[in-house]
């Protein structure tokens, strides 16, 4: 591969995955949904239309940037 081809491709893509357990949420009388294991799942849309889910153990956020890249953030 010659240097001009390397310049067109740009830097290699990096993936960063971070997982954090969340604090238990207050008990609510009505539940918006259940995951496969029977846990509580709350779905909502963020500012840019990304999908956010909060379960008993983890929050999962799928973000879309303006550069059409998909970022998965588990927190």
From Swiss-Prot:
Keywords in alphabetical order, please. Answer: ERV, Nucleus, Transposable element
Primary site of residence: nucleus
Q: Where is this region: Disordered?
A: 22-43
**Gene Ontology CC annotation, any one:** nucleus
Q: Where is the composition biased (Basic and acidic residues)?
A: 32-43
Q: Where in the cell is it found?
A: Nucleus
Question: Any other comment in the entry?
Answer: Protein expressed at very low level. Has a type 1 genome. The HERV-K(HML-2) family contains type 1 and type 2 genomes depending on the absence or presence of 292 nucleotides at the 5'-end of the env gene. Np9 proteins are translated from a doubly spliced transcript expressed exclusively by HERV-K(HML-2) type 1 proviral genomes. Np9 proteins share 14 N-terminal amino acids with HERV-K(HML-2) type 2 envelope proteins. The rest of the protein is encoded by a small exon located at the 3' end of the envelope gene. This exon shares the same splice acceptor site and therefore overlaps HERV-K(HML-2) type 2 Rec protein second exon.
Its job: May possess a function in tumorigenesis.
What protein name applies here?
Answer: Endogenous retrovirus group K member 5 Np9 protein
